[in-house]
């Protein structure tokens, strides 16, 4: 499978998705036809989100079609060479995708060769579940099971920073709480600006910040950038 899982879409001083364009170009391998899943967009319309994505990716030769605009979404997924899932609200993304019957067809198409690109909520959707999203508002998605394309949980926008005087939990503490109730999970803390590229069964972390792996009862482990690892059970 070919996956590009990004923590976020925008970096300080850069245009929207600018930092991701070289990564996307590197994984295209001749693919040009893309469907865009805009359902995570809450404060922008799906048309606006789709048009913005299409404009940014056009210089790479990618032809983007919003899945909400087609008469037969399942046929569009089957024909797509690239499936792009935008960030925003993970719960809304899951709810709309599930209600339209898109989850299994998307997963199947990626397993048969389509490139999957997702940022923030889109990275969450590639995981076994969406249980490591940060998002509010919460809507009922009728279940948390996601695409299960990547075998580990991802926490996008990961940071342990706390404002001075703030008494709430750090992000790591929240992840540790999850691992108490679900010790079978492994969670990747993916900071902003970072990503994971998957190809041929190998995952390669990248970005300017440290990516962390959390397991129940173990110390956090830093993933070395550009060092491939196999996240699938042996």
UniProtKB/Swiss-Prot annotation:
The answer to whether the entry has keyword Hydrolase is: yes
Enzyme class (EC, first level): hydrolase
- Keywords from the UniProt entry: Cytoplasm, Dipeptidase, Hydrolase, Protease, Serine protease
- Name the active site residues: 120 (charge relay system), 135 (charge relay system), 157 (charge relay system)
Q: Keyword DNA repair on this protein?
A: no
Which Pfam family is one of those matched by this entry?
Peptidase_S51
Q: Where are the transmembrane segments?
A: none
Give the GO biological process terms.
proteolysis
Catalysed reaction(s)?
Dipeptidase E catalyzes the hydrolysis of dipeptides Asp-|-Xaa. It does not act on peptides with N-terminal Glu, Asn or Gln, nor does it cleave isoaspartyl peptides
Q: Superkingdom, according to UniProt?
A: Bacteria
What compartments host this protein? Cytoplasm
GO CC terms: cytoplasm
- Name the EC number(s): 3.4.13.21
Which Gene3D superfamilies does the entry mention?
3.40.50.880
Q: What are the GO MF terms of this UniProt record?
A: dipeptidase activity; serine-type peptidase activity
Membership in a protein family: Belongs to the peptidase S51 family.
* Its biological purpose: Hydrolyzes dipeptides containing N-terminal aspartate residues. May play a role in allowing the cell to use peptide aspartate to spare carbon otherwise required for the synthesis of the aspartate family of amino acids.
Report what the protein is called.
Peptidase E
This chain's source organism reads: Salmonella gallinarum (strain 287/91 / NCTC 13346)
């Amino acid at each position: 499978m070919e996956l590009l899982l990004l923590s976020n879409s925008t970096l300080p001083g850069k245009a929207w998705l600018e930092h991701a364009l070289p990564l996307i170009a590197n994984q295209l391998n001749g693919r040009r036809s893309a469907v865009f899943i805009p359902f995570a967009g809450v404060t922008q319309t799906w048309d606006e989100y789709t048009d913005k994505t299409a404009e940014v990716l056009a210089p790479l030769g990618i032809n983007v079609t919003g899945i909400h605009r087609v008469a037969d979404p399942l046929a569009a997924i089957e024909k797509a060479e690239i499936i792009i899932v935008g960030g925003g609200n993970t719960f809304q993304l899951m709810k709309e995708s599930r209600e339209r019957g898109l989850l299994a067809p998307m997963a199947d198409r990626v397993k048969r060769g389509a490139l999957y690109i997702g940022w923030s909520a889109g990275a969450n959707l590639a995981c076994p579940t969406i249980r490591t999203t940060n998002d509010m508002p919460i809507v009922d998605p009728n279940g948390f099971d996601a695409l299960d394309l990547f075998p580990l949980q991802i926490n996008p926008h990961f940071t342990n920073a706390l404002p001075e005087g703030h008494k709430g939990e750090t992000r790591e503490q929240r992840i540790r709480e999850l691992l108490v109730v679900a010790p079978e999970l492994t969670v990747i803390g993916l900071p902003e600006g970072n990503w994971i590229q998957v190809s041929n069964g190998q995952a390669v972390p990248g970005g300017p910040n440290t990516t962390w792996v959390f397991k129940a009862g173990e110390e956090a482990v830093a993933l070395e950038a550009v060092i491939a690892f196999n996240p699938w059970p042996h």
